[in-house]
Regions:
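Short, solvent-exposed interaction modules
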Residues: 89-118
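Extended intrinsically disordered, low-complexity coil regions enriched in Ser, Thr, Gly, Ala
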Residues: 65-96, 131-143
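Acidic, proline/glycine-rich low-complexity IDRs
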Residues: 1-4, 122-164
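Leucine-rich tandem repeat or coiled-coil scaffolds
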Residues: 3-4, 25-34, 41-42
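Long, intrinsically disordered low-complexity tandem-repeat segments
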Residues: 5-28
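Short glycine-rich, low-complexity/disordered patches
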Residues: 51-66, 107-126
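N-terminal, charge-rich interaction modules
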Residues: 34-67, 73-74
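Short, surface-exposed loop/turn motifs that are enriched in glycine and acidic residues
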Residues: 30-35, 90-94
Length: 164
């Protein structure tokens, strides 16, 4: 797909570091199981952002799977030139992202580990070198990472990106 090749054609590095910042109560096995999936999410986000604008600076993703609605709900914010943009992600990237997120949850279930109800993934593009952070929340109400329909989710995304 064209958005997948966006970073390759520009020769950008896809160096990522998947880290779970909220490790209390999460087993090492569950954290290790999440790292490859977090890296895949980072790759999808970075390629999708590069397909929209080559010199993007930050991307934030929040995903909710609270059971009240079918599937996984996602919210993505792209920061470019100091401004935030919503609704930017190509449909193909959204589909790929949802597949990765569903496989991540399925793997945690297979391991009989707590499955995240909410997830934050932030990525910073520093001249083609990527830094990332992921935070999983397994409390049923999604906590600080609940996507609010009909409200601005920008402050939540910016809070997750702070200090990254």
């Amino acid at each position: 797909m064209p958005w997948e090749r966006a970073l390759e054609t520009r020769g950008r590095s896809l160096e990522t570091r998947g880290r779970n910042l909220e490790t209390r109560g999460r087993s090492l096995e569950a954290r290790k199981a999440g790292e490859p999936f977090a890296a895949q999410v980072v790759n999808v986000l970075a390629a999708a952002a590069a397909s929209v604008v080559w010199d993007w600076s930050k991307v934030a993703l929040v995903a909710n799977a609270d059971g009240a609605l079918p599937g996984i709900q996602t919210y993505a914010l792209l920061i470019w030139n100091g401004r935030g943009f919503e609704g930017w992600m190509p449909a193909e990237a959204t589909e790929d992202l949802n597949r990765v997120l569903a496989r991540w949850r399925a793997e945690l279930e297979r391991l009989s580990r707590p499955v995240w109800a909410a997830l934050f993934v932030g990525v910073v593009n520093d001249g083609g070198r990527l830094r990332s952070r992921w935070i999983a929340a397994d409390d049923g109400d999604c906590g600080a990472w609940r996507i609010r329909l009909g409200e601005s989710n920008v402050p939540m995304a910016e809070r997750g990106l702070a200090g990254l």
